[in-house]
A protein has these predicted regions:
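Bacterial N-terminal signal peptides that target proteins for export
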Residues: 2-15
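Catalytic Cys-His active-site segments of thiol-dependent hydrolases/isopeptidases
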Residues: 280, 288-310
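Boundary at the C-terminal end of the N-terminal hydrophobic targeting segment
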Residues: 27-32
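Bacterial N-terminal signal peptides
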Residues: 13-24
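N-terminal propeptides/low-complexity segments immediately following signal peptides
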Residues: 34-57, 61-73
């Protein structure tokens, strides 16, 4: 399958998961057996929602042992009419985070609760100063060394202003899609601000779920935190209703309920700490700084509650306007009609979101380009720096860097390798989480999940297919960048600066020095360490298993019998490892494809040379493009 066709396909499915979230569980099971391009069976009634507890992992064990729920709606009123929800005042002694009871379609208000930790609202809207302080709050988290959402918010280094202002034992947990909402809600709570966020989505008007047509969504439910406010321990678990589908909203939006975010122009004023990045292949990140080289640094969260850091580059896909991909900012919210009490707190009122035509930095230029003759087809968009057209990711860098900035091939190569090395270190931690949880000691399941990149349960928490695809893409991008620098040279591009005498030799020397400095270690099944250099990783990259049921030796691509001697995988696991090779060879995260294969399915696909996976891994060797 070509990359462009794949993108059409995954946009066509449009995270059909979002639609499934609005169905009872019995209907979801029926839909799971139906190809996504066919009509789904009608939902059947079920007896109440069933909770799914978060798995305790080493990353979450540091948090207090209060129940945390990863909730998804199980039932809703007939006809999907608005479900009434009235605020109820009640004293709170000790509140634990429990699952919400029903699908929140329509407008809903958080229940008011009295007590020391009530979310008291003293101001009606964010100011420019609030936005600056929020940006600083995000920057400090990003530049700290905190490893989980809980650690970040309870650390005096990562969160110096608010770390001590929590109810005793309050846990903090956010994964991929939750993170932007969680951090925005947290800052609003700490600063006496109201907050509203989407709780349910459906297909956007004019969008169908037919195979081959792009899908995008509209908001059909919102949760409003207005005065008198709730206890935050009740309000925060509501954020678990959010999925990546809540970001897959079109730039030109026609839904009745306004979305949480809006697309912005690529400028320093709009791309800053707190801005959100939506990768259309299914991941969310939050910008924490833009450096003097125009590099966008971000934080992102994962199902095991870990928090990692990265740099925006070509590995993050550019998407079309209907996908909602790219850079977004929070839509301003204003509390209107509230009354102020003698103690300064507000009561009553309702939240109003600012419409697109009121937003000074709303822009769709990241989809349609900056050329005066904008193309209707986003794939043909041209991005200009002055009068010169550049590719999109270079455009982002040059727009955000100081005027006149030029790329230094040596420094770009150095930073690419360092970013890869940081990603490898983060993978070490991710694999360790699965090993510490004992997943590799469990029997191999008879099938893969319905999609290995977008799923729930232990696979979501412990498997690394998306992380590994990102890592492989980074290796490929390194090779492509070096090849481009070597081919073009500074004399042929006004955006490249190089002061040396032999660019190829200097690139090769930089590559060698940085590669030698990059080393990671993992623990084998018996606890003994294995030290791997950059060259070792490059050689075994497409042998590294993403499957958490495999031993750590195979998770790190071991092939030497001596290294594998401590691996306890049985014949079934070895067979699965071998059969997954085609999936390991691919870089594209096929989030729109059904992938609940058996072992025999994978073997048959290899025999028939199907379009699932790739027969051959891509070339990621850098030295070969520099040595003639």
């Amino acid at each position: 399958m070509s990359k462009s066709n794949f993108l059409k396909l995954c946009l066509a499915r449009g995270f059909a998961v979002a639609s499934l979230l609005l169905l009872p569980s019995a209907a979801r099971e029926a839909v799971a057996e139906t190809p996504f391009w066919q009509a789904a069976p009608a939902p059947s009634k079920v007896q109440g929602p069933q909770p799914q507890k978060r798995a305790q992992t080493p990353a979450t064990k540091g948090a207090p042992k209060t129940e945390s729920w990863r909730w998804r709606p199980e039932s809703a009123p007939d006809g999907w009419s608005e479900f009434p929800f009235s605020p109820v005042a009640a004293p709170v002694e000790a509140v634990s985070a429990e699952k919400p009871p029903v699908a929140l379609i329509g407008d809903h208000v958080a229940p008011s609760m009295t007590g020391r930790w009530q979310w008291k609202i003293t101001r009606a809207a964010w100011t420019g100063q609030d936005e600056d302080r929020f940006a600083e709050f995000i920057r400090l988290i990003g530049e700290s060394n905190c490893k989980t959402t809980h650690d970040c918010l309870t650390s005096p280094i990562a969160n110096p202003l608010y770390h001590g202002n929590h109810p005793p034992g309050m846990p903090f947990f956010a994964d991929c899609a939750d993170l932007p909402f969680y951090l925005r809600a947290y800052f609003s709570w700490q600063n006496g601000l109201p907050f509203s966020f989407s709780t349910a989505v459906s297909l956007h008007p004019g969008t169908t779920a037919a195979k081959g047509s792009p899908s995008s969504f509209q908001v059909i439910g919102r949760y409003h935190i207005v005065p008198p406010g709730p206890d935050p321990r009740v309000a925060f678990p509501e954020v678990a209703r959010v999925s990546t589908a809540h970001f897959r909203l079109p730039a030109v939006y026609r839904g009745r309920m306004l979305p949480d975010h809006y697309p912005v122009a690529i400028t320093r004023e709009s791309i800053k700490a707190g801005t959100i990045i939506f990768d259309p292949l299914g991941h969310i990140a939050v910008v924490y700084k833009v450096d003097d080289h125009g590099r966008v640094h971000f934080i992102d969260a994962h199902p095991d509650n870990s928090l990692t850091r990265g740099v925006y580059d070509s590995e993050i896909e550019r998407g079309g306007p209907d996908s909602g991909a790219g850079f977004k900012r929070w839509r301003p919210q204003t509390l209107i009609g509230a009354k102020r009490a003698a103690d300064g707190t507000l009561s009553g009122g309702r939240l109003k979101l600012m419409s697109d035509n009121q937003l000074p930095d709303w822009s769709d230029e990241q989809y349609h380009g900056t050329d005066a003759g904008r193309s209707a087809d986003w794939r043909s968009a041209r991005f200009l720096i002055g009068a010169d057209a550049v590719d999109y990711h270079a455009f982002v860098r040059l727009r955000l860097a100081p005027a006149g900035y030029k790329f230094d091939p040596i420094e770009e190569t150095r930073q690419r390798i360092r970013n890869i090395c940081r990603e490898l270190e983060q993978r070490v931690a991710a694999v360790d989480v699965a090993v510490q949880a004992g997943i590799n000691k469990r029997p191999q399941p008879p099938r893969l999940p319905s999609n290995i990149y977008v799923t729930q349960g232990d696979w979501e928490t412990y498997a690394t297919p998306s992380r590994d695809a990102q890592l492989k893409s980074m290796f490929r991008a390194l090779r492509e960048d070096v090849a481009r620098f070597a081919a073009i040279g500074p004399s042929q591009s006004k955006f490249i600066r190089y002061d040396g005498a032999d660019l190829r030799a200097d690139l090769l020397g930089t590559y060698g020095a940085e590669a030698d400095a990059c080393r990671v270690s993992y623990k084998k099944s018996d606890g003994s360490p294995v030290h791997l250099g950059f060259a070792d990783i490059k050689r075994r990259l497409f042998s590294m298993s993403f499957d958490p049921y495999h031993c750590p030796e195979r998770r790190w691509g071991a092939s030497d019998p001596a290294e594998l001697a401590t691996c306890n995988d049985d014949k079934t696991k070895v067979s699965w490892y071998e059969a997954q090779q085609r999936l390991r060879n691919q870089l594209v995260r096929t989030i729109g494809d059904r992938m609940d294969f058996t072992l025999e399915d994978l073997r048959r696909q290899a025999r028939e040379n199907s379009d699932v996976g790739e027969d051959v891994a891509p070339n990621i060797d850098v030295a070969s493009v520099l040595v003639k």
